Amino acid sequence: MKVLITGVNGFIGQALFSYLSEQTDYSVFVTSRKFYQAGLRPDEIFFVSDISNSTNWMSILSGVDVVIHLAARAHVLEKDGVNSANQFNSTNVDGTLQLARHALQSGVSRFIFISSIGVNGAETINK
């Protein structure tokens, strides 16, 4: 079974990759913005610099049975300026929808989306 994990450099992604790569029934592939995850072989990594509604996932999803989507923008920072909320939405909403649509079109049989409250942004009340 071919499994694609997005967000492999995060806490859950690292643990999930380690676990699944030890299982003999799985061929595990990952996406990453940057490479630093120890133990990954280059043929297991697809570099995706931007997750948005314009990301083309079709070649990456070829032959994939399961997508486990963990990648997200977890922080909206003041220094990002006026467009930070738009960038946040572009990755976490539009980018996730684009991946799900392409997974459906590619015949992926399972799409597992793991998220947290952090994708809604963190804001201090009465700041």
Task: Indicate where each model-derived feature is located.
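Conserved glycine-rich Rossmann-like NAD(P)H-binding loop of the short-chain dehydrogenase/reductase
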Residues: 25-34
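N-terminal Rossmann NAD(P)H-binding glycine-rich loop of SDR-like oxidoreductase domains
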Residues: 3-23
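SDR active-site strand-loop-helix element
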Residues: 6, 31, 67-73, 111-117
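NAD(P)H-binding glycine-rich loop region in Rossmannoid oxidoreductase-like domains
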Residues: 36-37, 44-91, 102, 119-122
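Conserved Rossmann-like nucleotide-binding pocket used by diverse enzymes
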Residues: 4, 29, 47, 89, ...
